[in-house]
């Protein structure tokens, strides 16, 4: 049986992460530990033309109608997609964010208060740790495997010992493990 990694911990990761990300800017360093391709590989001229063409056709009201909780038609389509997979969710229950990290931050802000304990998969993507640090949360690491996902035994042990307010998981294409959590 696997066990939670140590006890809960207050985080101090942002400075270290920013040092690593800053090193990516040094052209003498090959960033093997990050997913940033060489900037010279980007077709910037072509991307610029595509963006300019898209901007010419942009509905001026989109800057207002697409504000949170999101574009109404997109929310309807997402609700239909959930329904096709067996989950009945109304469009009013869906909030569209500009990315996974904004969604994670909103969820953690809604569910926790500074000093609360959350469980995270280990290893995990650093930005989730930064969000936890910024919100003043403590974390307990739960071992995860790319084939089997989070150790349910370790999670149960942690839940029996501590009051866990939220559980942070990356269920599909986990970073850094690359796995998809089984059903």
Language-model segments: what does each one mean?
Residues 51-183:
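Conserved core of the PLP fold type I
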């Amino acid at each position: 049986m696997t066990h939670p990694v140590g006890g809960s911990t207050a985080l101090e990761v942002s400075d270290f992460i920013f040092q690593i990300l800053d090193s990516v800017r040094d052209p003498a360093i090959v960033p093997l530990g990050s997913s940033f391709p060489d900037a010279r590989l980007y077709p910037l001229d072509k991307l610029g033309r595509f963006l300019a063409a898209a901007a010419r056709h942009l509905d001026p009201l989109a800057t207002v109608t697409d504000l949170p909780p999101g574009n109404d038609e997109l929310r309807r389509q997402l609700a239909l997609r959930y329904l096709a997979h067996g989950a009945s969710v109304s469009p009013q229950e869906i909030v569209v964010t500009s990315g996974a990290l904004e969604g994670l931050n909103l969820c953690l802000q809604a569910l926790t208060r500074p000093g609360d304990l959350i469980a995270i998969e280990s290893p995990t993507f650093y930005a989730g740790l930064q969000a936890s640090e910024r919100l003043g949360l403590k974390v307990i690491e739960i071992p995860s495997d790319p084939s089997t996902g989070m150790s349910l035994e370790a999670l149960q042990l942690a839940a029996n010992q501590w009051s866990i307010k939220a559980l942070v998981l990356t269920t599909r294409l986990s970073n850094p493990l690359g796995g998809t959590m089984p059903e």
